[in-house]
A protein has these predicted regions:
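N-terminal plug
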Residues: 30-39, 45-95, 107-116, 131-138, ...
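Outer-membrane beta-barrel domain signature, especially the mid-to-C-terminal portions
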Residues: 468, 556-558, 563-572, 582, ...
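C-terminal beta-signal and adjacent terminal beta-strands/loops
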Residues: 623, 706-714, 718-729, 738, ...
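Transmembrane beta-strands of outer-membrane beta-barrel pores
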Residues: 130, 161-165, 172, 182, ...
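Surface-exposed, low-complexity loop segments enriched in small/polar and acidic residues
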Residues: 199, 203, 209-214, 247-280, ...
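Short strand-turn segments of transmembrane beta-barrel domains in outer membranes
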Residues: 125, 152-178, 268-278
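Predominantly transmembrane beta-strands of Gram-negative outer membrane beta-barrel pores used
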Residues: 143-147, 156-163, 172-205, 284-292, ...
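A beta-strand signature from Gram-negative outer-membrane beta-barrel systems
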Residues: 107, 116-160, 200, 711-725
Length: 908
């Protein structure tokens, strides 16, 4: 962590370095201004006594508000990138992903807005989980509200190239989007293509593991029972018992004497036949059309289509050949076994192809004081997996057994004797459709304020058709699920200082919510929630809530096709060794629904008036019965609880693991997460009318009229007060992105309790003290996320850092052989330059107008987790390059916004 403050200090020098260059006249942001009233959306507008346009339903104020100037400090291109960058701020202690709203309204899916450029955003708000209830969502996810400019028009193109500094792999992507926003509605079309090359084991510093059996390209000889003596005569030559012997290279040409086999076993480095990362290709198209129909109903239609392909190499095919003692090519007294890699055929591979289609619609309107929203979606996903495991050598083995003198077992297998390829196939087709209707309005008025209600009705159908062929055995799975759902949420005001009712308490309200889902395959599932929202003084808000709900396993967890993947490298905690196993994955039709109870207590504080400083803290306590989970890492405790999931050979070596999902009897967790957000304008652009001609030109470029003049001392120049009242919150001042601005955030999560009762009769796993369910150790007690950003006249730098404390995992039957997983600090750094804001550069090269150049470094110091056993040795499967194959990588992107042609004629 000592590197973090040093790096922040380096970033702090950026304004001084930028100020040393020749100053150009201040220039506004060239990325699509808004209409007159919004002053290009860059100057903050403080609305007193009323809520700003696009605000969410209810009286819960945002935890964080980002202005266009704040968003520019992130240096990201689209709403997708922005949401990813806001991960620390949108993480929920309850585990759900954030809900995303558009202009304070529901959308059919994130695909509606994912490709919108960040320049089109007027405001972004992050709100607590309780706001999700007001929109018919579950209270386990935070809410992000994106408010767009009323008018915006541009075409965007971006080219990106990335590669790790250690080489071996590269990624390229190209994307383009078209966006039109005006009073008639919105149209967005986006195309993307991305390709990443494969990364092989021999391209990293990896020590190959000894295979379970002594396979080699030339071959090795053992007794029929592995571990027994091959031949007493060979042992006499070696002067010790010989259980494995290398085949001499000359044996591929003709028969060799026994003395030629008195040699060490042969080994083959298969790193160039095994991928750490597969080759991937992805192409997608996304189209969105929004219009107003029937006079006052907003209608949106969205369609997406994507294709993804992944190809991985899993090592050389193997052959275990029985060699009779009478064979003319065998010098041994009795039967032996030959282990060979078959390099004369293609390596073992796995290919996956996924085709995904999506259609969605959204209707929004208002009637008789109630706001209503209807959404519908249909998604179809087809996944095909093809695994090549080698070839059938039964004909070749038959010839060897028949003592055919023309068949040399040590020579390449003749093509005529190679049988059909051993190929496993799996195919799944999933279709999901849903329609939801949500209405929100006022039921009654109490002295403390209106009683508001949110009602949701919905229906959903799911179909999953899966087929798989493994080792010649076919399995079919055809599942369907229909869901009828309803939810009601009531907000009850209890006290209000603004309304003069029990004023000393401040603003106090209660929420009660109830949901019921009827599943065709699981019956009825209920959700009950209740909580309090209290603002005793404007600078402090407290929220307490309890949610009790039931959740069914997903269709994929129940019915995905069974797939066997050979050559998967894992660490066997029982024997303390790394082994290559066959991993069985797929669905588990015996899973049960879980039952959970979550208590949350949260506080948000804005302590200083006129400063964009926010402090937040959340305590979350959850209990889950029959928790559905992926199969955990194979520790001794897990194998004792699920012995039927593990297969070992006669020597006790692990050969197969069934990793299909399971139910845990009970899971308990407690955590405290606190954080700080700070944003400040360090310097402002030169004042005066010098910027006005440029703003007018920029407004024309985006299809808007010229921005209105603002007198000095207007609301845009006044400092804003802290608090949670209407219009209160928000970040950022500074038109056009000029001047200097900084942003900082840090979040610290302390895990107080992480326990899992695997089965009713045990064992109880303590993930904070010696147990694990994942492959990267137990649950770190401490996790820290930090961000810092600085922009100066279009030049910016952004740093993000993450740190997690180390853990220990007990191994061996008695838990004495432990593994230590080190702490890990990763730092990412991004520099970006909005070239369009550099007036002299644009004058010299007009093409650079509206362009941005970005240089990103991921894992700046090339840090990787270190894993060591009790003797200080790193197990083969936990070598650093296995845990993080890429390491430090560099990404360069060039992005260009193409504005529409300027209108002809004299300028006003």
């Amino acid at each position: 962590m000592v590197r973090l403050p040093l790096l922040l200090s380096g970033i702090a020098l950026l304004p001084a370095l930028a100020a040393a260059q020749e100053r150009a006249p201040a220039e506004p942001d060239r990325h699509g201004p808004a209409p007159d009233a919004e002053m290009a959306g860059d100057e903050d507008i403080v609305v007193t006594g009323q809520r700003p346009p696009g605000s969410v339903i209810g009286d819960i104020a945002p935890e964080l508000v980002l202005s266009p100037a704040d968003i520019r400090t992130y240096g990201v291109s689209s709403i997708t990138d922005l949401i990813a960058e806001l991960g620390p701020q949108t993480t929920s202690g309850r585990g759900g992903r954030p809900v995303v709203l558009l202009n304070g309204k529901r959308i059919s899916s994130f695909a509606e807005i994912r490709d919108i450029p960040t320049e089109a955003i007027l405001r972004a708000e992050i709100l607590p989980e309780e706001v999700a209830l007001k929109y018919g969502y579950r209270a386990d996810q935070k809410v992000v509200n994106i408010v767009l400019r009323p008018r915006f028009r541009t075409t965007t193109a971006e080219l990106t190239g990335a590669a790790p500094t250690e080489g071996g792999q590269s990624s390229t992507s190209a994307e383009s989007s078209l966006l039109r926003i005006n009073k008639e509605g919105r149209f967005n079309l986006a195309l993307k293509y991305q390709r990443s090359s494969a990364l092989y084991e021999d391209e990293r510093d990896i020590v190959a593991d000894t295979p379970r059996r002594p396979y080699d390209v030339t071959g090795n000889i053992t007794a029929p029972v592995y571990g027994d003596e091959i031949d007493p005569a060979l042992s006499a030559l070696a002067g010790q018992p010989v259980t494995a012997a290398g085949v001499p290279a000359a044996a591929a040409q003709d028969a060799q004497p026994l003395t030629a086999f008195n040699r060490p076993i042969n080994t083959t480095d298969t790193g160039r036949y095994r991928t750490l990362l597969p080759q991937t290709d992805s192409v997608s198209m996304n189209a969105v059309l929004n219009r107003t129909i029937f006079g006052d109903v907003s209608a949106t239609v969205n369609g997406t289509l994507s294709y993804d392909e992944s190809d991985s190499a899993q090592g050389l095919a193997t052959a275990s050949i029985r060699l009779p003692g009478e064979s003319p090519f065998s010098p041994f007294a009795g039967e032996t076994r030959l282990y060979r890699y078959l390099d004369e055929i293609d390596p073992r591979t796995q290919q996956s192809k996924t085709v995904t289609g999506h259609l969605g619609f959204t209707l929004s309107g208002a009637a008789k004081g109630w706001q209503w929203n209807a959404t519908g979606n249909y998604d179809r996903t087809e996944i095909r997996t093809r695994t090549r495991n080698g070839v059938d050598i039964a004909d070749f083995q038959a010839g060897i057994d028949a003592l055919d003198p023309t068949l040399n077992p040590f020579a390449p297998i003749p093509a005529a004797l190679m049988g059909s390829p051993l190929i496993d196939r799996a195919r799944s087709v999933e279709g999901v459709g849903n329609i939801q209707l949500v209405a929100n309005g006022t039921l009654a008025r109490l002295p403390a304020g209106p009683v508001s209600a949110t009602v949701k009705l919905g229906g959903e159908f799911n179909d999953l058709d899966a087929h798989s062929t493994r080792a010649g055995m076919m399995t079919d799975s055809d599942l369907s699920r229909d869901i009828a759902s309803g939810q009601i949420s009531l907000d009850l005001p209890l006290a209000s200082r603004k309304r003069g009712f029990i004023g000393p308490l401040g603003e106090l309200s209660a929420n009660v919510n109830l949901a019921y889902d009827r599943l065709s395959d699981f019956g009825g599932l209920t959700t009950l929630g209740y909580g309090l929202n209290w603002t005793p003084i404007p600078a402090i808000r407290l929220i307490a809530s309890v949610t009790e709900d039931e959740n069914a396993p997903t269709m994929q967890q129940l019915g995905n096709p069974t797939i066997a993947t050979s050559g998967v490298r894992i660490f066997d905690y029982v024997r303390g060794e790394t082994v290559d196993v066959t991993r069985i994955s797929g669905g588990n039709p015996t899973l049960q629904a879980d039952d959970r109870r979550v208590f949350k207590l949260g506080a948000t504080i804005r302590p200083f008036t006129g400063n964009d400083l926010t402090l937040s803290a959340d305590y979350v306590n959850s209990r889950v019965r029959d928790a559905v989970a992926a199969f955990p890492t194979p520790t001794a405790a897990i194998e004792a609880a699920f012995p039927d999931r593990f297969v070992r050979d006669a020597s006790g070596q692990l050969v197969s693991v069934d990793s299909r999902p399971i139910n845990f009897t009970r899971q308990n967790s407690e955590e405290l997460r606190w954080g700080i957000n700070f944003s400040k304008q360090l310097s402002s652009p030169p004042a005066g009318a010098g910027n006005r001609p440029m703003l007018r030109e920029l407004a024309r470029d985006a299809g808007d009229g010229p921005p209105a003049e603002r007198p000095a001392g207007s609301d845009a120049d006044r400092p804003r007060g802290a608090g949670f009242g209407p219009g209160g919150g928000g970040f950022g001042r500074g038109p056009g992105g000029r001047g200097t601005r900084m942003q900082f955030a840090v979040y610290h999560t302390v895990h107080l309790r992480e326990e899992i009762l695997v089965r009713p009769d045990g064992p109880m796993l303590d993930l904070l003290d010696g147990d694990a369910i994942g492959s990267t150790g137990g649950q770190p007690r401490h996790e820290v996320e930090a961000q810092a950003g600085l922009t100066h006249n279009g030049l910016g730098a952004r740093l993000s850092a993450a740190w997690r404390s180390g853990t220990d995992v007990n191994g061996g039957p008695d838990g004495s052989d432990s593994l230590h997983f080190s702490s890990l600090t990763t730092i990412n750094l991004r520099f970006f330059a909005d070239l369009g804001q550099q007036a002299k550069l644009v004058s010299a090269v007009p093409f650079l107008r509206g362009s941005r150049l970005t240089l990103s470094v991921t894992n700046l110091f090339n840090e990787r987790m270190r894993v060591r056993d009790a003797d200080g040795i790193t197990p083969v499967s936990y070598q650093p390059d296995y845990l993080d194959p890429l390491g430090r990588s560099i990404r360069i992107s060039f992005r260009k916004l193409f504005f529409p042609p300027r209108p002809s004629g004299p300028r006003p």
